[in-house]
Amino acid sequence: MSKKDRRRVFLDVTIDGNLAGRIVMELYNDIAPRTCNNFLMLCTGMAGTGKISGKPLHYKGSTFHRVIKNFMIQGGDFTKGDGTGGESIYGGMFDDEEFVMKHDEPFVVSMANKGPNTNGSQFFITTTPAPHLNNIHVVFGKVVSGQEVVTKIEYLKTNSKNRPLADVVILNCGELVRRKKRQHSSRSNESVSSSTSTEKSHKKTKKTKMKEKKRKESDEVEQLEIGTVVPEAELQLSSVKAEDLPDEPDHQNKYLMRRSKTPENSRKGKKEKQRQSPHRFSRRDIGHRLNRMRRTRTGHKIKGRGALRFRTPEGSSDHDGSRTPPHWRREQNRVITLDELHRLQEKRKAYELEELENPKNDVVDKAKTGILLNTSEKIEDKEERYRGKSEKKENRHERSRHTTRRSPEHVTRHFVKEKNRHKVDEVGNSEDMKQTKRDRRGRADEKEKVEVNGEKAAAMDELNLDEPTVEVTLDSAEDIRDSDDEAIRIHLLKAKKMAEEKTKQEAKMLEKTGDKEGRDQKTISEAKQKDSAEKDRQHREHKNDELEKRAIEKQDKDQIVERDTGSKQRRKSDSKEHRGKTDRKHRSKSIEEDGRRSTSREKLDDLKRKETSGQKSQADSEQTVEAKTNVVDSNSDNSKMSVNGKLKEVSSTNKENEVSEQKDLKAESTKSEEIKQQVNEVSRKQKGGEKPKEHKRNERSRSRRRRSRSNGRRRRSSSRRSRSRDRRHKSRSRSRGYVRRFEGWSRSRRPTRRELYDERMRRERERRRSFDRYSDRRRTRSRSARRDSDRHSRRSRKRSPSSSSSSSESSSSDSRSTASSSASSKRSSSSDSSRSSRSRSSN
């Protein structure tokens, strides 16, 4: 089969009742003949009714139930309409054909399935390339025209289950047939002329040959829908009747004239009246109009020329209600509530069922139909009256709002009227509810009658009495009558035929039902006996299981009691061990304190010895200073005796030397005082319990040794403990870290994670504080050392002039030595402090 012989199919689609357009699809008969035949027969409806569902195998009236943007649109479920139904012409489902064609371009038609070899009637049209569907879904066609209709459906709004909010219905579908064009007389003339030209023996060129080929090809093709003037054997007649077509208007081409709906005479009359009116240009009239148009509902003026915005005022309550915009009101009037729609549908269906079941009782039917029609007309009249009243009231309120402010009396009147109106509506609704309840009872009785026969139940299923609740938006209440689908009409016609056949078969069915009832009773009694025997057996098994469970529970309780007694004895032994440990700790602490006291006494003795040695060194330094002064005096006398002409210069130099020596004496005295103060501070610290740095260092080293010894003891004791615990409880293993972790807690209660975390954070804070204190001390010491070095440098500069004697040099060297000794002592103290801080951080 060539590509020219491929068949074409069309689908006329409506969106929310409006015709969207036609989708034309070309089928790949040569690649997937079985799937193409299934799709073609479902489009034409020539396959009859389904074997499983019992419904007509036809896409007409079905919907596109699934729409995914930038992916595909899916339809073809003519049985349920929600994607869970559908049936092929082969009965149920059929196997996949070869996956030759791929989903490598948009607008490809492919079969939907639930898995391999589960093709039914559902199909989908891709809107983008979808290579992930290759070798899963069978491609059997492509969209030739109507791509814009597919994109329009694709961009519809959907709910959470990808179902479009607007109803997308296949209004009509079928096959397109090719036909040859009629040959015109001009072509026949050309053929005659060509024959004469051959007689004259003119040679044909390539161009003429090509032209003839093109003519032959153009003769083939023109597409026709089924239902146009073609041979009856090839085509199927259309279902459109002449009665259904609307009447032609009087002026067919009147829509081409761009005129308004109002007649010309009335418009001319209005214009003339406006021209003739005396107050047309009066200022008073203009002001009145402006005031009338530009006031809020509370009476305030609206300034400005812009469009009015509808909003609730700030001071008003929700009960008061703002002015609803006119376009909102129009839309609200168009919408009908679900309850009203269900009521009307139920009445219609009840009426149709009564007609089908009781065709003889014409008088009763007429009376019932009259009642139903009257009730529906009353409801519609009530709705229209309510709409008219609401519009009039709104206009009247608007006029009163524009002219005057609302007084409290006016507000009370308004609320009283609204309450009365609501009461009237509630009374009307209650009457409608009573009527609907009666209708429901009647329908329930009818259902019971129908369920007597199996075929009547099938007819009920076909009519779909229990339809899903869907919100429907109609242009007016009258459109509800004309909103029946063609599918429902077809179902009704079939139901009429079935009713005629049922009257003939009722006698046979009654006999069959009697036999079936007897058999059913026997089977039910047998099933009851079997059920009772099974229940007794299950009851006995259940009792046995309960007894076994109780025995097992008793055994478990006894074991738990034995374990508890053993654990109590172990706790007592553990508490004894804990007491022994605490006693040992207290003893070790007392021994350590005695050692510390002895070391502190030794340190005090050392300090006293150092103080005595310091005092001796001070006395020696004073003696040396006196000797130096004597030497200076003798030198000055010799200089006076030797040099008689320069007495004034020598006297000036002597004075300078004396001043420098006095300064040195003062500095040495201040140093001696500082040393005494330091000694006093050390003695105070010892009395108050504080210790100097050297003593602290010695104590730390000793404490480290003790710790190492105690750690060794702890390790031994912990290893012994762990062995004993392993013997008791193999599951619980206590390491050294685990014991140290719970040191401060009693054995009866172990700490929680939160408590451990708090303890860790507290230690961290203490460590940081100690480090901060140490760093502050170090900073202050470094500053004091800098100051001392600066002072010494200044003094050395003052003593450095060349005219100074050897005595000054010796004094400066002494001062340098003292400064260096002090600096070295400070460095050693700082290094000791840094070591101590490191040891703390490591601890």
From Swiss-Prot:
It comes from Brugia malayi. It comes from the Eukaryota. Residues 186-198, 801-843 have a biased composition (Low complexity). It catalyses: [protein]-peptidylproline (omega=180) = [protein]-peptidylproline (omega=0). This is Peptidyl-prolyl cis-trans isomerase 1. One of its GO terms (molecular function) is cyclosporin A binding. SUPFAM superfamilies: Cyclophilin-like. One of its GO terms (cellular component) is mitochondrion. Gene3D superfamilies: Cyclophilin-like. Its EC number is 5.2.1.8. Relatively insensitive to inhibition by cyclosporin A (CsA). PPIases accelerate the folding of proteins. It catalyzes the cis-trans isomerization of proline imidic peptide bonds in oligopeptides. GO terms for biological process: protein folding.
